[in-house]
């Protein structure tokens, strides 16, 4: 098994200068298996798991859950990269390879949902980093999270690039019987070279679209978010047409599709010069 060769380290061992301040009490796991070599996971016990989104934001939701910080999907344009600097890590390589795992997320959520002050409001997931990144295959936090939401009949939505969502089909179906469940898969383009250049850790776009169709085949409402559309890279008529055709090929198996635009961030802007060389 690919997870059998992990190494368990104490954050108190080794060079303390390399351990972020927040991780002094974390369990640190590293891997020497293909696909995970160079990755570091910081297992922490979070104090809370449901975050409030300020009303001043233009988001359509007010509550979110993010069981991970950092993301192996390594999308170069990701707006959440800057949040890694708050943990004394960088927004580039560290964001892709040093992931914080909130191992007590399901337990915290159950407590929140049972608290007298909770009004059963909609909770959005996948809004910051992908909750179905590869680490989820090991930690399985989403199964506990979905089960908690199901048991409380609390409405929720998930946005992901991860085909691993199909693993939780059984729980999603059970949740959909008692509450509103909204699912979206992100796939803005189908160009293979572009995908490998700017979304190197994600499943292929075609696989994501197929995962969306499979969810619909099983009675769950799932749409494709054609986003983010990356300026100068995936916004040409040819690129957009190819993506629409791929989605349309699934026919009635896709409930809906809507576009979204990537907005420039400091890391996004700096990386664009590299993309020009990669894709030339």
Predicted regions and their residues:
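Auxiliary Fe-S-binding modules of radical SAM enzymes
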Residues: 1-45, 51, 235-280
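Conserved Radical SAM active-site core
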Residues: 32-69, 76-184, 188-196, 205-213
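Short catalytic/ligand-binding loop motif for oxyanion handling, primarily in non-cytosolic enzymes
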Residues: 87, 132-133, 233, 263-265
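Non-catalytic positions within long, well-ordered alpha-helices that form the structural scaffold/packing
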Residues: 150, 216, 245-248
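A structural motif
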Residues: 153-154, 220, 251-252
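Short hydrophobic alpha-helical runs that function as membrane-insertion/retention elements
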Residues: 157, 223, 255-257
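Active-site glycine- and acidic-residue-rich loops that bind
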Residues: 163-166, 230-241
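Conserved strand-turn element in the central/C-terminal portion of the radical SAM core barrel
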Residues: 190-192, 199-201, 214-236, 259-262
């Amino acid at each position: 098994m690919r997870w059998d060769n992990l190494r368990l380290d104490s954050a108190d061992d080794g060079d303390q200068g390399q351990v972020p301040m927040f991780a002094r009490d974390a369990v640190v796991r590293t891997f020497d298996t293909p696909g995970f070599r160079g990755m570091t996971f910081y297992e922490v016990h979070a104090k809370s798991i449901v975050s409030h989104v300020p009303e001043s934001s233009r988001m359509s939701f007010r509550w979110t859950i993010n069981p991970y910080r950092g993301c192996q999907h390594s999308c170069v344009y990701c707006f959440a990269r800057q949040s890694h600097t708050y943990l004394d890590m960088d927004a580039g390589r560290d964001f892709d390879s040093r992931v914080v795992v909130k191992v007590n997320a399901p337990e915290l959520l159950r407590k929140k949902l049972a608290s007298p002050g909770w009004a059963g409001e909609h909770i959005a997931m996948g809004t910051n980093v992908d909750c179905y990144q590869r680490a989820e295959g090991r930690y399985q936090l989403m199964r506990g999270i979905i089960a908690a939401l199901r048991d409380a009949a609390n409405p929720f939505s998930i946005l992901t690039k991860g085909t691993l969502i199909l693993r939780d089909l059984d729980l999603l179906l059970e949740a959909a019987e008692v509450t509103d469940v909204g699912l979206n898969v992100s796939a803005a383009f189908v160009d293979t070279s572009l995908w490998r250049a700017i979304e190197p850790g994600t499943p292929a776009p075609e696989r994501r679209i197929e995962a969306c169709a499979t969810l619909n085949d099983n009675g769950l409402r799932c749409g494709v978010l054609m986003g983010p559309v990356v300026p100068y890279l995936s916004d040409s008529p040819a690129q957009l047409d190819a993506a629409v055709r791929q989605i349309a090929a699934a026919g009635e198996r896709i409930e809906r599709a809507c576009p979204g635009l990537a907005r420039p961030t400091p890391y996004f802007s700096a990386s664009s010069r590299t993309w020009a060389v990669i894709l030339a």
